[in-house]
Amino acid sequence: MKKIEAIIKPFKLDDVKDALHDVGVSGITVTEVKGFGRQKGHTELYRGAEYVIDFLPKVKVEVVVEDSLAENVIEAIENAARTGRIGDGKIFVLNVEQAIRIRTGDRGADAI
């Protein structure tokens, strides 16, 4: 199994959610996060004072899928989240040794 984590722009969440549904993903976890990469922060002016915005708002989408579905999921996220501008985000792929559904005790692929 693979855990796929994608850090994306918040306004792309609905597109990514729809794309994941289209490739057969049945559940996702979404977290509002802040961070920066090459995009860095920016400066804003408010009531005559200058403020540095170090961390930019992003959304982290997490999904665990069987190995056979991983490439389709990665491609779906990539295509749905891409704007072509700096700050589109990152995708991380991790191995998952075990998944357990707490309610039923199902393990492995049956738990996801």
Please give the residue ranges for each predicted region.
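Positively charged, small/polar-rich N-terminal and surface patches that mediate targeting and assembly
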Residues: 1-112
